[in-house]
UniProtKB/Swiss-Prot annotation:
SUPFAM superfamilies: Ribosomal protein L36. NCBIfam families: rpmJ_bact. It holds the Pfam family Ribosomal_L36. GO terms for cellular component: cytoplasm; ribonucleoprotein complex; ribosome. The gene is rpmJ. GO terms for biological process: translation. Belongs to the bacterial ribosomal protein bL36 family. Keywords: Ribonucleoprotein, Ribosomal protein. PROSITE patterns: RIBOSOMAL_L36. InterPro entries: Ribosomal_bL36, Ribosomal_bL36_sp. This is Large ribosomal subunit protein bL36. One of its GO terms (molecular function) is structural constituent of ribosome.
Amino acid sequence: MKVKPSVKRICNKCRVIRRHGRVMVICTDPRHKQRQG
């Protein structure tokens, strides 16, 4: 899980979602997981 000030999709499988007011990227590749914070 990477924590970044700005989250972006890395590949086509990445999905930008909101959970509990946080913007997150979920993907089939675990290295692409990101959270804004």
